[in-house]
Every structure is written in C-alpha cells, then in structure tokens.
Amino acid sequence: MSKYKFNIDNYHAIGHADIEIEGITVIVGSNGCGKSTMSRWLYYIVNTLSVLDSFFFSDFRDVIIKSLEKYSNALDDISNYLDDDKKRFFDHTLSLMTMVTLSNGGVEKLDFYYKRAIGSLDDMLVNFLQKEQNPQQVRRVLNLFGITEQNHVHEDIERNSIQLFSEYLQKYEHNKKNRPISYLKEKIAAVYREKDGFPASISFKEDEVELLVDRLGKIYSLNNAIYIGTPAAISLRQSDRVLMTSLAHKVVHVNEKGSEITGKQELLHSINKMIDGSIVEKENFDAVDLVYHSNNGKDIRIEDIASGFKPLVYMLRLIENGWLTENTLLEIDEPETNLHPQWVVELAHLLVRINKTFGTKILITSHNPDMVSAIRYISEKEGLLNTTRFYLAEQSEGTDSFYYKNLGCDIEPVFESFNKSFDTLQKYVENYGEI
C-alpha cells in the first residue's frame, strides 16, 4: 500500500501544510483556513498526473484534426464541383479521428485515418481543378492547400501532409519523453478552469519519491481522485463546477474498469438502511433520472433530497458503479454538514468501512468534534489506526496564515481548539447575562 505526502506553503490562507495520506487522513480547521483549497489542489495533481500520457496524446490528436478542419470551409464553397459521397466520407473520417484515444489504437490508428482523410482531400481537389475555370479561384484554393503548381497536386499534398504529421508527432513524443512540469500547470488551468496561479511551493510524493519535478514523475498506485464538496455550499468558482460535473458523471455512469469486491453488497445494504430507502434509475425521455425511493413509497429526485443525505447517496452510487477502489483517493469536504449527531457517527463508520473494504484512501476535512472522534475510535476498532492521520489547522498569531499541525492519532488538541469557542460564549454570557 503506497503512502503519499502532499505539501503546500504560503498559498492563500495556507502558511504551511505537510500532510500524509496512507489510509484515512482528517484535517480539522475553522472556515477560511485553506483546507478546501488544499483538497482541491491535491485533486488536480492526482487526476492530472494519472492521465498525463492521455493528455499528451489527445492534444496531438486534436491539433491533427484541426489541421484538416481548416479545409472544411473551402470544401463547402466548392461543393458544387464535388461528389457528395466523398465529402461525407471526409467528414466521417474526421469524426472517427475524434474517437481515437491512447488506449484504443493511439498513433497508429490516428495515422491511418489521417492518411485516409488526406487521400479523400486529394481526390476532391483533383475533381475541383478539372472543372473550375476561374484562375483566381483555382489559385486561392491551391494556396490554402499549400500547392505550388496545379500539376503538382499529388506530390505537394503528400509532402505537406507527411511533414505536418511528422512535426506534430515529434512534439507529442517530446512531451511524452520529457513530461515538463509547465505542461501540468497549463493543463490544470485549462481543464479545471483554475483562475488562481499554480502554488509557488508545492510538493507531492509517492513512497518518498517526489513527482512534481522538472520532468514529472509517474504516479503508480492512484489513478483517480473523487471530490465530494460541502452539501449545502453554493460556489461561483468555475473549478468547483468542473469538480461537481466529474462527480455527477461517476454517480450516473458505471466504471467499466471496476470489478466486484467482497463486502460491496454489505456496504450498499448498510447505506440503504441508513437512508431508509434506495436509489433507483427512472427513464425521462432520452435521459435517466436518479430517484430516491423511500421505504414508505415516496420518490424524490436526488437533486431535491435533503443536503445531509447527499454524501450518503453519492457514496452509494460510487460504490454501486465501481469507482471506489484501492487506486482511488476519495476527498470529502465537511461531510457532517446538516447531519444529526447520530448520523455523523454512522457516516464516520461508513467511511472507515470503505477504507477497509476497498483500500480507498480518504481525505476528510471537518470542523466537527463528533466526526473527528468517531473516525479516531472506529479506525482503532477496525484495526486501521496505524494508517489514520489527524491534522489541525492553527492560525499563526497576528497573521492570516494557518499552519497544519500533525497530531498523529492524538485528537486531544482538536477538542482544546473547540473549547475556545465555549470560552468565547462564556465571555458573552458574562458581559450580557443572556443571549
């Protein structure tokens, strides 16, 4: 089982955070201490590193397709000279190219479709030149295709296409070999629409090996991070919407690479019992709605259920669809929000069981002493305390920065920090008598 260390320094409210994730990690802190910011960046790093090679390939594929799409306007313009079947064949080939991935044919299949598209262009261009009488229009089209002389159509198209594909392939292979950290930064900004700059001081280690170096390391044992945000939170951040969209996809769709794991059905039964019902799929025209079906026969769409229910429903569907595995990092932000104290303990028990059953690594941010206490003692009961960590975000005196203190398994400082709120309450009572 791999161990991870994640560090951010001097970024927004975070003064220093150096956390370890081996099983379950709990980060405790007040609102505004930067714990959600840290979770978000960990999510970005894991999900970008784990599919970096696929990103390299998709960029290569997309630029090849774009190089062909630029001819579409010209083909539409000269369509009266063209065979409709040939134009449809060209468009269909471009459509097939968009579906090529690193895992289903890669460069070889893309090269095959590219040559097919170029051959189709060659045929259509020859057709056009045989019929077009306007020399200006002929020269205009030849210039677009990079053809020097009308009688050099085949040679020029072949030479130009080979050169173009070779240049883009060389860039793809260069990126794949060198894995520049600048590419990671650009991808995070683009994919997650992250407006804030990349942290100047950030580190991510797998089994003590630093991965965020000039030549990015490969992540071996994690292939997916899943983020469940605070149920009642409303965010205007575009990056938060991207995270929510990714979660929604997994809640709806089955992980084709998932497998049946012993204990899965027991967990699903436990969650159904907790929510006193089940989640069913109901067809809605060409879409599928997820509906909470209570044991007393009431149906509610999951977007309309109580916010405290939602983390439980999300986890139920993630388990059903095979997304929670030993290669998954589950990040859950303040899951206790809007939950009755008894449910907090039940939820903590569920999270510990997920870790034990699937080997899923879990990062929990919280400011609830019941959640912290429940995770601590249930982990011990389940024999998982040696891989459970607790951190407390403490504000540096006279600053807006928070430093994350490693508590190990000693959660007493957490309760001491919560006692400060009671001290504040006592001052109000002393000053005003009643509230």
For each predicted feature, which ranges?
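Switch/communication elements of ASCE P-loop NTPase nucleotide-binding domains
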Residues: M1-V51, V291-Q426, E430
